[in-house]
Structures are given as C-alpha cells and as structure tokens.
Amino acid sequence: MPTINQLVRKGRRDKTAKVKTAALKGSPQRRGVCTRVYTTTPKKPNSALRKVARVRLTSSVEVTAYIPGEGHNLQEHSMVLVRGGRVKDLPGVRYKIIRGSLDTQGVKGRKQARSRYGAKKEKS
C-alpha cells in the first residue's frame, strides 16, 4: 500500500491489456507461407483430426494456424492470409487461415455462412 506522498510523486500506473494476436503486429491480417500442413487431435472431451498449418508470416514470426471448413488445397509453400481467432480445443492455435484468398480455395458446395469460407453463390 503506497503512502499519499508516494502517490503524489509517482501516481498509479494503468494495467496494459495483453495482446492476444501478437504475431499480426497490430494488423487485421497478415500474409504468410505454409511451412508444414498437418492434422492434430483436440483436447480431452473432443475427438477429431483438425487440419492446421505452420505459417511463416511477413512479420517473420512462425505461427500455427487453423484451416477452417471441409477439405482444403493447401500444401507446403502455399501463400495464405492469416487472421486472429483461437480454436478452443487446440492448445497453441491462436490464428485462422482466411479461405478464398491468395492460394487458399473456398469451401466447395457451401450454402450457408458462405462469406466466412470464401464460397461463391451456386447457380440455381
């Protein structure tokens, strides 16, 4: 507990909020190159093979990014656009790849929430 005199001299310091997407360096998205594309298993109550990619960003930081949607065309050396947003059941995965931009194709046959997955409107 500081004294009144100490508060007069120094004042109180505001707590700084922790940045959750440090690798983006304040940008909304970052471009990157896939260094490894693989599957991993989620945390305890869930069971699946989640598709993830190790991405080297233009900010020269290497991050693990989730590939959303069913099926993808990514492989090593693919150019991708990465945004923030964690995957709750994958520890250490704090970024997502944006579908339908750069080398990443949109999800085929997607009818709902198409803009999130880069899917074009189907001709009826």
From Swiss-Prot:
GO biological processes: translation
Tell me the domain of life: Bacteria
Among InterPro entries, the record links this protein to: NA-bd_OB-fold, Ribosomal_uS12, Ribosomal_uS12_bac
UniProt entry keywords in alphabetical sequence: Methylation, Ribonucleoprotein, Ribosomal protein, RNA-binding, rRNA-binding, tRNA-binding
Pfam families (alphabetical): Ribosom_S12_S23
- Cited SUPFAM superfamilies: Nucleic acid-binding proteins
A GO cellular component entry from the record: small ribosomal subunit
Ranges in coiled-coil conformation: none
Q: Which residues carry this modification: 3-methylthioaspartic acid?
A: 89
Q: Where is the composition biased (Basic residues)?
A: 108-118
KW tRNA-binding (keyword) present: yes
Q: Which intervals of the chain are annotated as region Disordered?
A: 1-32, 104-124
Spans traversing the lipid bilayer: none
What role does this protein play?
A: With S4 and S5 plays an important role in translational accuracy.
Q: How does it assemble?
A: Part of the 30S ribosomal subunit. Contacts proteins S8 and S17. May interact with IF1 in the 30S initiation complex.
Q: Which family does it belong to?
A: Belongs to the universal ribosomal protein uS12 family.
| NCBIfam families the UniProt entry points to | rpsL_bact
Protein name, per record: Small ribosomal subunit protein uS12
Q: Which organism is it from?
A: Rhodococcus opacus (strain B4)
